[in-house]
């Protein structure tokens, strides 16, 4: 069964909408195979987003991701990655379709509520970054 990683970012955790977001995943037929709340360290955030290290927004992204707790989850189901990306909506919440997570819960392109894997290969690597295999069931 296909798996993908979801991160509910600090802005959405602070708004106390974690349950509403997780409910969207389950209502769309995705199973939450693993989930945990944690505080990323600067080293964690830099390592996770290393692919963006040369980009001008990298420093701000890292600072944002360590600004409060996050909720990381492994979502599982048929076409899990594409389904999650559809549920999230466009990166910029102003461009996100009505009813998507970002349209409903995000404030800006930076504080955009959620992260989702953008390829199956990245999903595998991102899941392994946060979860041991025995934690996923």
From Swiss-Prot:
GO MF annotations in UniProt? ATP binding; metal ion binding; nucleoside diphosphate kinase activity
Listed under subunit, the entry gives: Homotetramer.
One GO biological process term is: GTP biosynthetic process
EC number(s) in its UniProt entry? 2.7.4.6
State where ATP binds: 9, 57, 85, 91, 102, 112
Database matches in PROSITE patterns: NDPK (PS00469), NDPK_LIKE (PS51374)
Q: What is one cellular component GO term in this UniProt entry?
A: cytoplasm
Q: Provide this UniProt record's keywords sorted from A to Z.
A: ATP-binding, Cytoplasm, Kinase, Magnesium, Metal-binding, Nucleotide metabolism, Nucleotide-binding, Phosphoprotein, Transferase
Question: Which reactions does this protein catalyse?
Answer: a 2'-deoxyribonucleoside 5'-diphosphate + ATP = a 2'-deoxyribonucleoside 5'-triphosphate + ADP; a ribonucleoside 5'-diphosphate + ATP = a ribonucleoside 5'-triphosphate + ADP
Annotated active site residues, numbered on this chain, are: 115 (pros-phosphohistidine intermediate)
Compartment list? Cytoplasm
Q: Please name the InterPro entries in this protein's record.
A: NDK-like_dom, NDK-like_dom_sf, Nucleoside_diP_kinase, Nucleoside_diP_kinase_AS
Instruction: Give the protein's recorded name.
Output: Nucleoside diphosphate kinase
Domain of life where this protein originates: Bacteria
Question: Would you identify the family this protein belongs to, as annotated?
Answer: Belongs to the NDK family.
- Reported cofactor(s): Mg(2+)
Task performed by this protein? Major role in the synthesis of nucleoside triphosphates other than ATP. The ATP gamma phosphate is transferred to the NDP beta phosphate via a ping-pong mechanism, using a phosphorylated active-site intermediate.
